[in-house]
């Protein structure tokens, strides 16, 4: 998934991301995907994440919503079905990360040793991932049914979740270079790493390209 399926959810009096300037935004914990998404999303709208908003770790989704109800925070972030549940509480979705920029927070990870010793196994997993993503994109009803059974949620929530994340999925598992670079820079910031980190230090897309060719997918 080349884009983060994370939504910025606010109390109803806030009509735009810009209105969060000077406010407190709740996240689950520091050092994770929600903190990164919060920083990148407000920055996209011209807000300095270091000076013009305050991030507050308020725990799991239920606690984050409680903090908003109590007026301790103006907004929070979360992946579906957080946006669906937030709307049920009367909150509003101001922005979705995958609609603003590429920021891959999920993918296939393997050690260098594994890549060298078992490339065919990795390629099979990648092909399965491509096929599953294509099923997800092309088969709405089948996917929603699977979600109700696997996630143990009702159809309304499954449908809302599907619609929220659909555009974030890639039909060939391609990873945009700008998204990977953004991910690296954010990881460097969190880990306080100052040296340059080349993309080939953290990503090997050669097996993905091979899998795409074997499936007849044109290179982008």
State each model region's role.
Residues 60-151:
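Pocket-lining segment of extracytoplasmic ligand-binding domains
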Residues 188-220:
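Conserved C-terminal helix/tail region of periplasmic/extracytoplasmic solute-binding proteins
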Residues 54-56, 160-166, 197-209:
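Short linear loop/turn motifs
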Residues 41, 85, 146-147, 186-187, ...:
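Residues within well-ordered alpha helices
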Residues 1-60, 64-67, 74-80, 92-97, ...:
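Short, glycine-/small- and polar/acidic-enriched structural segments
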Residues 14, 47, 153, 192-193, ...:
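Helix N-cap/coil-helix junction residues
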Residues 117-195:
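Secondary-structure end/capping motifs
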Residues 19, 25, 99, 120, ...:
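Short capping/connector residues at structural and topological boundaries
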């Amino acid at each position: 998934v080349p884009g983060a399926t994370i939504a910025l959810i606010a109390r109803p009096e806030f009509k735009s991301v810009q209105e969060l300037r000077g406010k407190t935004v709740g996240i689950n914990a520091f050092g994770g995907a929600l903190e990164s998404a919060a920083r990148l999303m407000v920055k996209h709208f011209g807000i300095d994440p270091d000076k013009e908003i305050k991030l507050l770790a308020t725990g799991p989704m239920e606690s984050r919503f409680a903090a908003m109800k109590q007026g301790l925070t103006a907004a929070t972030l979360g992946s579906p079905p957080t946006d669906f549940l937030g709307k049920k509480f009367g909150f509003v979705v101001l922005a979705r990360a995958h609609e603003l920029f590429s920021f891959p927070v999920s993918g296939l990870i393997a050690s260098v040793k594994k890549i060298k010793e078992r490339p065919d196994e990795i390629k099979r997993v990648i092909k399965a991932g491509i096929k599953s993503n294509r099923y997800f994109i092309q088969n709405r009803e089948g996917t929603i049914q699977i979600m109700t059974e696997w996630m143990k949620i009702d159809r309304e929530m499954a449908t809302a979740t599907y619609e929220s994340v659909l555009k974030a999925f890639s039909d060939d598992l391609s990873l945009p270079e700008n998204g990977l670079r953004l991910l690296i820079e954010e990881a460097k910031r969190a880990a306080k790493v100052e040296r340059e980190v080349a993309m080939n230090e953290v990503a090997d897309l050669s097996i993905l390209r091979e899998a795409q060719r074997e499936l007849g997918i044109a290179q982008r």
